Amino acid sequence: IPAFKLHASGYLMKPVSAKDVQVEIDNIKGIRQNQKPLTVKCFGTFEVYAKGEKLTFKRSKTKELFAFLVDRNGAGVTVAEIGVALWENDEDQKNQNYIHQLFRDLRQSLEAVGVEEIFERNNYFYSINPEKLDCDYYEHLKTGKPEFHGEYMSQYSWAEETCGLLWKKRT
């Protein structure tokens, strides 16, 4: 049946009964409940969605910090590494203090949508838990699906390294 090629969540054939409709609705509800609470789009420009709504951050650097942690795919990074990435090789102490403000803002933004457990701290290392995100980049790494079309977090210069690796892998 051609409709299955559309990757539909369900399909009803005539004659349709109320029971058939209810089965399909329950199936869709089950799919939605199994979805991860945060959706992250890395290909193109970086965006974050919570329950279908774009997540807003108090500061643009907070969003960039979250993008950097997503790019690291669960690997822990230090405040110094974050400072070098976000301020392009400027290890100014003032920036390191500002990073702690960004961490607070990130925690508050995640708490506001009930997903604060995504952000993790282990001694001096900060990371996110990739298992709690629905992320196009992570999906691409797992499955190799051709979702990458040349742009990766295009608003951040530090993401060019990952973009280059994705291009290399593509060819």
PLM regions with names:
Residues I1-K5:
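Alpha4-beta5-alpha5 "output face"
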